[in-house]
Each structure stands twice: as C-alpha cells, then as structure tokens.
C-alpha cells in the first residue's frame, strides 16, 4: 500500500495531494483547494509571485482606453526585466541554472518568475532575503517552489501554438527572451564562472597599482560607472 501511495503522489490519481501544485507550484483554487498543497522545506527553485507586469496587459490611457505597445517595445521591456532579475539573483545569491517567467493571465500564475538555482542553500538564502525587499515599488513575495522539471509544468499545446485555453490555461505559458539575451546570459556564463577567480586577482592587482599612483585601475572604474548608469536606467530592486 505504501508503495502504491508513493507511486501516485502528486499525480491526478492522488486524492489527497494537489497534482497542479506539485507540478506547477500554483493552483487556481489557492487556499480553497480541497487537496493539500505540500510546500517544500527545501528546493533548488524559488517563485517570485506576480512580479512581472506585462505592458500589453496593463497599459491604459487616462480615459480607460488601451495604449498600443508594439512587439518590439514589448520585447525590449521584457528583456530588460529578465536581465535585471537574472543578474540580481546570480550576483547576490548564487549560480542560476534556469529562470522562467509566466505569461499566463490567471491570478495564480500571472507574472510569476521561477528561478532554479544550482544549490538548494542559495535558493533558501534568496527566499529569506527577498521577502524583505521590494521590486518596482512593490514588496516581493518569494517562496520555495516544488517545480524542478519545467517540462512537466509547461503547456505543450502552447509551445506548439495550439493551446485553446489562452492566457487562463492552468499550465505554464513561458515567455521567451530574445536569442541575443539568451546567448549573453546562458552561453557566456560558464566561461565567466571559470574565469571569476582570475578576474578577482586581476582586479586586486589593478587596485594595488592604482593606489601606488599607476593607471591600472581605470578600466575597473569605467566598468563601475557603466554599471551605475545601468542601475539608474532600469534598477527596480
């Protein structure tokens, strides 16, 4: 009996535990669900709930009419958001294996961001810290998520352009980033991690030369100025 219960745990045959929450980390019934939502005590994945605001869904003029947002503007806005959050997660908490943003419209999925870290310890640290932070003028609600395999959580029909449920589908409709940004964030990341220790040594030597009156620290200061300008332009944390 125990083996059978273990085999059906989190599936549609399980009458006790919610299969949607187990697969997707969210359920449209919320706390009213008749089945249990077993929140994980440890996980590689965290969920930032309702943090992404899609301009195409929210932009309205003062008279209540919708403002047109072009596809190009939409992609630029989304890429900026994705890069900002991804970079913040890696710089403050640890290596990110995967990050996904829901483009659904249902209240339980709209704007959810799922960040899968390489280490569970980094995910735990991120949740504790992020729940004391704000983003874009709103408090962040972060929690550990049971989702580790996004292939199970995604709507396959949506990926093939055939989902008939639209934005209110209960499976994830993941919003893609541009190819250029994907290459930048994921393609170069491994090289960056391999060279990180060497970069620290070079920066240390540059600072030492700068204090000694040489000009070796100029490149580092210029990078800091560029980062500062970038944060002023798009920083919402």
UniProtKB/Swiss-Prot annotation:
The answer on whether this UniProt entry bears the keyword Nucleus reads yes
The principal location of this protein is: nucleus
Q: Where is the composition biased (Basic residues)?
A: 188-208
Name a GO CC annotation attached to this entry.
spliceosomal complex
> What are the alphabetically sorted keywords of the record?
Acetylation, Metal-binding, Methylation, mRNA processing, mRNA splicing, Nucleus, Phosphoprotein, Repeat, RNA-binding, Spliceosome, Zinc, Zinc-finger
Carrying N-acetylalanine, the residues are: 2
Q: Where is this region: Disordered?
A: 185-237
Mark the residues carrying the PTM N6-methyllysine.
Answer: 39
Question: Which GO molecular-function terms appear in the entry?
Answer: pre-mRNA 3'-splice site binding; zinc ion binding
**Residue ranges, compositional bias (Basic and acidic residues):** 220-237
Spell out the Pfam families in the cross-references.
RRM_1, zf-CCCH
Q: How does it assemble?
A: Identified in the spliceosome C complex. Heterodimer with U2AF2. Interacts (via RS domain) with PHF5A (via N-terminus). Interacts with ZRANB2. Interacts with SDE2. Interacts with SF3B1.
Q: Which PANTHER family match?
A: U2 SNRNP AUXILIARY FACTOR, SMALL SUBUNIT
Instruction: Give the family per the record.
Output: Belongs to the splicing factor SR family.
Q: What is this protein called?
A: Splicing factor U2AF 35 kDa subunit
Q: Which organism is it from?
A: Bos taurus (Bovine)
